[in-house]
UniProtKB/Swiss-Prot annotation:
<protein>
    <recommendedName>
        <fullName>DNA repair protein RecO</fullName>
    </recommendedName>
</protein>
<keyword id="KW-0227">DNA damage</keyword>
<keyword id="KW-0234">DNA repair</keyword>
<comment type="function">
    <text>Involved in DNA repair and RecF pathway recombination.</text>
</comment>
<dbReference type="InterPro" id="IPR003717">
    <property type="entry name" value="RecO"/>
</dbReference>
<dbReference type="InterPro" id="IPR022572">
    <property type="entry name" value="DNA_rep/recomb_RecO_N"/>
</dbReference>
<comment type="similarity">
    <text>Belongs to the RecO family.</text>
</comment>
<dbReference type="GO" id="GO:0006302">
    <property type="term" value="P:double-strand break repair"/>
</dbReference>
<dbReference type="Pfam" id="PF11967">
    <property type="entry name" value="RecO_N"/>
</dbReference>
<dbReference type="InterPro" id="IPR042242">
    <property type="entry name" value="RecO_C"/>
</dbReference>
<dbReference type="GO" id="GO:0043590">
    <property type="term" value="C:bacterial nucleoid"/>
</dbReference>
<keyword id="KW-0233">DNA recombination</keyword>
<dbReference type="Pfam" id="PF02565">
    <property type="entry name" value="RecO_C"/>
</dbReference>
<dbReference type="InterPro" id="IPR037278">
    <property type="entry name" value="ARFGAP/RecO"/>
</dbReference>
<dbReference type="GO" id="GO:0006310">
    <property type="term" value="P:DNA recombination"/>
</dbReference>
<dbReference type="InterPro" id="IPR012340">
    <property type="entry name" value="NA-bd_OB-fold"/>
</dbReference>
Length: 238
């Protein structure tokens, strides 16, 4: 079966045999796929410079099962310009998608969130808000439903000044005790819900929450992007 041209991004690529590539691709309509590009590394390949991360692509493939075969690929536009810490942050996002979402499952809304995150990273000096927004979008796509705006105990709206303790599978409970990991101020929960972070404390709280929420999906295996780039991006990816 051969599909028509689909909007895609290459998340990861690795050499295969003498001249081919295996691509981990994020497609708008088909989700994450493994695709082999035969001869892509040969000197005469017309795909040299095309199958790159962060480049908007149109791709066509054929086949079924766990590995498809690339039939056509062309760029929609130039690669999204990412450098320095923003490039490392984008690599982190790519690894999150590879590690967390299942293959062969469509995530059209998350694909647009991914494109938005890359665009934001290309336009900002501080990548943290874009990272937090994408992590929250990813959790939402996975069905990780959390009510940030209501106390799980009373059902009342959270108060910006009050402290709430997060309990997995239950939500946020009003608490007079402070837990460095699980306690959040009401204004932080509101900021997370709106995905709009005004203060450094709100950003730190959002990072804390996404780390807690993503941990079950990532398991005990560390992210390679953190290991590679943590010395240069300690404030962002730790």
């Amino acid at each position: 079966m051969e599909e028509g041209l689909q909007r895609c991004f290459v998340l990861h690529r690795r050499p295969y045999s003498e001249s081919s590539l295996i691509l981990d691709v994020f497609s708008e309509e088909y989700g994450r796929l493994s695709i082999i590009s035969k001869g892509a590394r040969s000197k005469r390949s017309n795909l040299k410079g095309v199958l790159q991360a962060f480049t908007p692509l149109l791709m066509k493939w054929s086949g079924k099962g766990s590995m498809r075969t690339l039939r056509q690929a062309e760029t929609i536009s130039l690669a999204i310009p990412l450098t320095g810490i923003n490039l490392y942050s984008a690599l982190y996002i790519n690894e999150l998608v590879v590690r967390v979402i299942e293959q062969e499952t469509p995530y059209p809304a998350l694909f647009l969130d991914y494109l938005t995150a890359l665009t934001e990273l290309a336009q900002t000096k501080n990548p943290e808000p874009a990272l937090r927004r994408f992590e929250l979008a990813l959790l939402s796509s996975l069905g990780y439903g959390v009510d940030f705006l209501h106390c799980a105990g009373s059902g009342e709206m959270v108060s910006p000044e009050m402290t709430y303790r997060y309990r997995e599978q239950k939500g946020f409970m009003a608490s007079i005790r402070h837990d460095p990991l699980m306690s959040f101020k009401g204004d932080e929960l509101i900021a997370i819900s709106e995905r709009r972070f005004i203060t450094p404390e709100q950003l730190k709280a959002a990072k804390r929450f996404t780390r807690i929420a993503l941990k079950p999906y990532l398991g005990g295996k560390p992210l390679k992007s953190r290991e590679l780039f943590l010395p240069r991006t300690r404030s962002i990816l730790k």
